[in-house]
């Protein structure tokens, strides 16, 4: 019986291990937002999840030590575009252009820890907002800017 590892289709990385096929490792395409449920349902035995999602999976998964995804320079895949400077966003309306909970949590932590601020929740892009967070390929496509938003932050 093969070990099924989730390959996140909306990120620019892929899990690999030497001689995967010979070792009985099979990749299954899964969306990042669907990975936690795929792990819970047993569709996959392993796969990358966001740090935020990992907290809710400790009853069904064990973290694998020694592995992580990181960037030493600006990644450009978790962005905040704002009409106001970051330090003025506490209590303002913030939209989420993508459904990535990690990017939203990165923004919350940055605002709270660096600027002693907070927000209640994120709104849809169609609603009036002062700033928006965006992640993944959508953020990479908009890495040069967003019309009407003078401030850009790489979270």
What are these regions (language model features)?
Residues 13-24, 103-121:
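Ligand-binding cleft/hinge of the Venus flytrap
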Residues 39, 68-69, 107, 134, ...:
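Structured N-terminal alpha/beta-domain signature
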Residues 1-5:
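Extreme N-terminal starter segment of soluble prokaryotic enzymes
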Residues 7, 29, 65, 96, ...:
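Structural signal for conserved beta-strand scaffold positions within catalytic alpha/beta enzyme cores
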Residues 27-40, 116-134:
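Short helix-initiation/N-cap motifs at beta->coil->alpha
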Residues 119-155:
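Pocket-lining segment of extracytoplasmic ligand-binding domains
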Residues 8-91, 98-100:
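Short, glycine-/small- and polar/acidic-enriched structural segments
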């Amino acid at each position: 019986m093969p070990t099924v590892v989730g390959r996140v289709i909306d990120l620019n990385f892929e899990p690999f291990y030497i001689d995967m096929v010979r070792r009985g490792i099979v990749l299954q395409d899964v969306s990042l937002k669907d990975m936690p449920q795929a792990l819970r349902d047993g569709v996959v035995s392993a796969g990358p999840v966001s740090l935020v999602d990992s907290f809710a999976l400790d009853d069904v998964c064990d973290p694998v030590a020694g592995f992580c995804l990181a960037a030493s320079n600006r990644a450009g895949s978790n962005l905040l575009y704002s009409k106001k400077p970051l330090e003025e966003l506490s209590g303002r309306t913030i939209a989420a252009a993508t459904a990535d909970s990690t990017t939203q949590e990165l923004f919350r932590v940055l605002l709270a820890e660096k600027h002693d601020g907070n927000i209640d929740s994120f709104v849809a892009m169609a609603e009036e907002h002062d700033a928006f967070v965006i992640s993944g390929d959508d953020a990479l496509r908009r890495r040069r800017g967003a019309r009407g938003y003078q401030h850009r932050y790489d979270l």
